């Protein structure tokens, strides 16, 4: 009986350590604001919405995006307005996706631009579920206004929060 209890405690401690590590990696910024700001292009200001071809919380792989990747709500990704796609590297099937800096509500995040949209007039970017949860953890807003989106030069950015 003692062995089962100690094994359960060890398992719980390991699970806690893993969850703390994951939580820290969510918060820890890989790129500094200064580096990102010097590597970014002209800003576009507008509204951002969230998209998921299924329903919020769905974790299965979705349909293919414009870049050919499968939609994944767990990565830092977004779809840029079709009329802006050239500014963000073309977003074409089989072409390496480009990256953008998205700023809103006092936060910054780097997202991979791997799809085109939104189709709703007045919106410039559709954030996937993970990126939108960074700005709106409850997903209650649906749309965030006064979002600043800047294309990032180069192909080797690590998507996620910017410090």
What are these regions (language model features)?
Residues 1-2:
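Short, small-residue-biased leader/transition segments that mark boundaries at the very start
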Residues 6, 18-163:
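Secreted/periplasmic proteins
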Residues 10-18:
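Hydrophobic helical h-region of N-terminal Sec-dependent signal peptides
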